[in-house]
Amino acid sequence: MALPMMIDCDPGHDDAIAMVLALASPELEVKAVTASAGNQTPEKTLRNVLRMLTLLNRPDIPVAGGAWKPLMRDLIIADNVHGESGLDGPSLPEPTFAPQNCTAVELMARVLRESQEPVTLVATGPQTNVALLLASHPELHAKIARIVIMGGAMGLGNWQPAAEFNIFVDPQAAEMVFQSGIPVVMAGLDVTHKAQILPADIERFRQIGNPVSTIVAELLDFFMAYHKDEKWGFDGAPLHDPCTIAWLLKPEIFTTIERWVGVETEGKYTQGMTVVDYYHLTGNRPNTTLMLDVDREAFVDLLAQRLAFYA
């Protein structure tokens, strides 16, 4: 039986590719997609969800837009990474269907209520919508099997020296998620920086030759440009968000550990830092499964295999 799940995302090139991977996988049943503000402004990320689902011919999946800003601060966006539209590069179709007449939290709550079994929630952007869901519907916590997030890191940042972008955008929301008591699986920079897509991989995807694989290659062409800056020291581009979906499909290609994680919400230099109790110094019980490593070749093979689904 397919795993019931929802995706909360802020497309974003890697969010879009995570959607492509999920919807090419019969092991997963995507019951809803909600949009968060992050990589771009909320109206743009919502439009990008609709554009991607139009490309993938999935107007049957309900969509809703979420919070317009983080819980306690102004919105920060990553237009320097993802461009003016949030999905710059390829020519994507205009949406052929409309979002639901409800908020992201209302849609997620409806899916949880109606599901006969617990639902996995994948969140590849800031955690604002997820935190609002948890705060407003404590009666539904038991219906959430796990929350799989892309965000954070054990020891480095990509937006601030100590903070990864998704967590830095809304650290208060992320802290609520980690301390919710619901199992969290974290794909942080420790693993996503090892899930790099190289130029040869992009050409492999392009050669698959269907409309979706071509769009994915063009998304990666644009995404690659930002990551060529020498400061990163990358050979390619880290494909952050698809690690969440890949873990659901093939957990055996990832190396993980169980640890307690908290989020620094106020630090002068460390606001947005995910604090990982690696040596069990706090006495807190582990609340998070952290991905630390990935078989890069197996990860790329999985993407290529699932892109062929769209032939």
UniProtKB/Swiss-Prot annotation:
It comes from the Bacteria. One of its GO terms (molecular function) is uridine nucleosidase activity. Its EC number is 3.2.-.-. GO terms for biological process: nucleobase-containing small molecule interconversion; purine nucleoside catabolic process; pyrimidine nucleobase metabolic process. The active site is at H240. Keywords: Glycosidase, Hydrolase. InterPro entries: I/U_nuclsd_hydro_CS, Inosine/uridine_hydrolase_dom, IUNH, Pyrim_hydro_RihA, Ribo_hydro-like. Pfam families: IU_nuc_hydro (PF01156). GO terms for cellular component: cytosol. Belongs to the IUNH family. RihA subfamily. Hydrolyzes cytidine or uridine to ribose and cytosine or uracil, respectively. This is Pyrimidine-specific ribonucleoside hydrolase RihA. It comes from Klebsiella pneumoniae (strain 342).
